[in-house]
């Protein structure tokens, strides 16, 4: 495991704990990582986690489109959308589906935990917690979709 994976995992966990404690993801965390992901592309020709530049750009767009309906319906906040877009920039589209899946499972586990131990369920849960922990899990376990990129 390289410093890139460890850095992305630490960044994701930092975002998750911030969203859990304060229910907000600051712009310096989300847009800073998105900017870093975009800055790495012309310098190296690939994203920070090694996917081709086309996968990183597609990852940003796919992350935006995946969470846009939930944002419009006020199920997630703008910080969650930017957090997921930064994950697309740092890891490419290959990591997005596994992160999205893990985030859903983690969020459902939080709901089940609250229902089981307190008997109550919040109206809204910080989705950044699931996204951050899911991203760390995916990055550290090297769980990716095997996509073949003609544009590299």
Regions found by a protein language model. Name each.
Residues 1-152:
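A membrane-topology feature that recognizes alpha-helical transmembrane segments
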């Amino acid at each position: 495991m390289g410093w890139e994976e460890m850095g992305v995992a630490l960044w994701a966990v930092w975002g998750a704990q911030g969203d859990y404690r304060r229910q907000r993801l600051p712009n310096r965390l989300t847009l800073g990582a998105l900017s870093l992901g975009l800055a790495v592309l012309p310098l190296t020709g690939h994203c920070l986690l090694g996917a081709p530049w086309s996968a990183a750009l597609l990852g940003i767009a796919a992350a935006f489109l995946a969470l846009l309906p939930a944002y419009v319906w006020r199920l997630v906040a703008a910080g969650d959308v930017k957090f997921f877009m930064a994950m697309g920039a740092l890891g490419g589209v290959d990591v997005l589906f596994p992160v999205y899946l893990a985030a859903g499972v983690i969020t459902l586990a939080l709901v089940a935990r609250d229902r089981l131990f307190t008997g109550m369920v919040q109206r809204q849960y910080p989705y950044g917690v699931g996204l951050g922990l899911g991203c760390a899990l995916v990055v550290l376990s090297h769980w990716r979709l095997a996509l073949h990129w003609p544009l590299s």
